[in-house]
């Protein structure tokens, strides 16, 4: 970890920067954990365990550098209900169910990257990060989830002396599908809640059309998000900076059944300064982020003629608007034996939800944490 953190380019989207360092390292780890307690979120397990393995490597050759890692994790949680998503809060919509049960989550991830010197002053490279996860709940209301998170980022760098300039393109796709089912023979159906923002939405029988968990033509709840953007990097001696912009376009539904659309914009900036002393190396880092996201609900009409059902889209209503700003300063001092790190994360978020005109609900949050 110290080798990775020593090179500021490793935290950027431009893989060509790994050649700004010449240290080759490999790493492997196996881990396990057990958790139990009542101080937890609504969707977290009453008790649970996880185990997994991680391996990573960076290799530098004469004109080429390679970077890669692989990880696997399995988590078992007991007494779980609430959000049906693998990563609650990642998307602006959520679905909640209320019967505690056991959940199993398996996560596979790998990343790879290559950087190549095409001339004395120019480098090119590309990287890919891939993560796949599946989760299942074994008690009604049962559900199975499949999640994908993939990022591809080609980059280029010009470097001469103490100066290095870089640029990279970023493409990211995330997707998750939820398939719900009721196997048991309960006297009544189970209920679920579709959260459309700030805990306003639809509460009904899980198979009702308002929840979209079980609809004619679509038997899953699919969410997709595509992001395209670019980043610029600069390094001069111990100073490093990067600015990144992403334009996102997300949908809930598939084919003609697009129930929600959530476009957004994201800007992130990071800066770092390194001073290498005789016995210690000092690092100062600063991250700043801004994100804006809107969500529109489609107005769909189903018309059946002669046994054929057609779906007509009559436009959409804006039902949610989110905007957030985050700041994260950090200081680190690393020596041969001792390492000290301290920092803070501050985040401001404003949300406006309006399910039905002219009624609206506004929320303003400020979160912070400090660590050492």
Residue ranges of predicted features:
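Outer-membrane beta-barrel translocator domains and adjoining extracellular loop/strand segments
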Residues: 38-45, 79-85, 135-143, 178-184, ...
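Outer-membrane beta-barrel channels and translocator barrels
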Residues: 61-64, 119-121, 159-161, 237-239, ...
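Outer-membrane beta-barrel domain signature
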Residues: 40-46, 97-103, 139-143, 217-223, ...
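Residues on the lipid-exposed face of transmembrane beta-strands in outer-membrane beta-barrel proteins
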Residues: 55-59, 110-116, 152-158, 230-236, ...
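N-terminal, post-signal peptide beta-strand-biased segments of exported outer-membrane/organellar beta-barrel
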Residues: 1-78, 91
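Transmembrane beta-barrel strands of outer-membrane/channel proteins
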Residues: 26-34, 68-74, 126-132, 167-173, ...
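Short, flexible helix-coil linker/hinge segments at the edges of structured domains or between repeats
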Residues: 81-94, 138, 171-224, 249-259, ...
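Residues that define the transmembrane beta-barrel architecture of outer-membrane proteins
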Residues: 47-53, 104-110, 144-152, 224-230, ...
């Amino acid at each position: 970890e110290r080798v990775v953190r020593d090179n500021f380019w490793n935290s950027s989207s431009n893989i060509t920067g790994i050649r700004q360092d010449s240290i080759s390292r490999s790493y492997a780890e196996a881990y396990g954990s057990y958790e139990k307690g009542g101080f937890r979120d609504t969707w977290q397990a009453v008790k649970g365990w996880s185990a997994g393995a991680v391996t990573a490597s960076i290799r530098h050759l004469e004109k080429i550098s390679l970077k890669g890692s692989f990880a696997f994790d399995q988590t078992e949680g007991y007494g779980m209900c609430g959000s049906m998503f693998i990563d609650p809060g990642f998307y602006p919509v959520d679905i909640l169910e209320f019967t505690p049960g056991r959940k199993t989550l398996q996560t596979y991830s790998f990343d790879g990257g290559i950087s190549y010197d095409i001339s004395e002053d120019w480098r090119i490279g590309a990287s890919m990060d891939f993560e796949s996860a599946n989760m299942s709940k074994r008690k009604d209301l049962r559900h199975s989830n499949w999640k994908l998170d993939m990022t591809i980022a080609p980059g280029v760098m010009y470097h001469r002396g103490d100066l290095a300039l870089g640029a990279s393109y970023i493409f990211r796709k995330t997707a998750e599908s939820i398939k719900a089912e009721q196997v048991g023979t309960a006297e009544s159906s189970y209920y679920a809640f579709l959260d459309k923002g700030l805990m306003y939405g639809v509460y009904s029988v899980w198979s009702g059309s308002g929840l979209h968990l079980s609809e004619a033509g679509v038997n899953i709840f699919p969410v997709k998000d595509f992001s395209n953007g670019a980043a610029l990097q600069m390094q001069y001696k111990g100073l490093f900076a990067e600015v990144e912009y992403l334009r996102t376009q997300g949908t809930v539904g598939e084919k003609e059944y697009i129930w929600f659309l959530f476009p957004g914009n994201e800007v992130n900036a990071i800066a770092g300064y390194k001073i290498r002393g005789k016995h210690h190396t000092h690092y100062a880092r600063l991250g700043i982020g801004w994100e804006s996201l809107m969500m529109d609900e489609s107005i769909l009409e189903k018309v059946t003629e002669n046994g054929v059902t057609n779906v007509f889209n009559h436009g959409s209503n804006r039902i949610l608007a989110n905007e957030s700003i985050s700041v994260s300063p950090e200081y680190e001092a690393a020596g041969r034996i001792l390492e000290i790190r301290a920092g803070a994360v501050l985040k401001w978020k404003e949300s406006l939800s309006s399910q039905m005109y002219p009624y609206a609900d506004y929320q303003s949050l400020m979160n912070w944490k400090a660590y050492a």
